[in-house]
Amino acid sequence: SSAASDVYKRQHTDHLYIHFAPNRLDHYRIAFVISKKMEKLAVRRNYIKRTIKEIVNISLKKNLSVDIVFRLKKSYYKSDFKTVKLDITNTLSKIAL
């Protein structure tokens, strides 16, 4: 395992794995792991990234110093936007770094 993955703490929901760790910046950074195996079309992968990014932008304070990585579970594709939004906002409120 890499040094970076050892630093990250993990939370999971029904539809996502969320890895997070503090950073030394005055803002948060977001990354995504959406494999081509799970979603073949780049258009759909980008849509997923945009929607999650928007949920995070609304939910988090801009000056929060944290790196967040979202990994999708297969169940993500069977869920609706409201469920995913609720999952993400609840998990982000638990993180509270």
Label each region the model flagged:
Residues 5-97:
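Positively charged, solvent-exposed patches that mediate nucleic-acid binding
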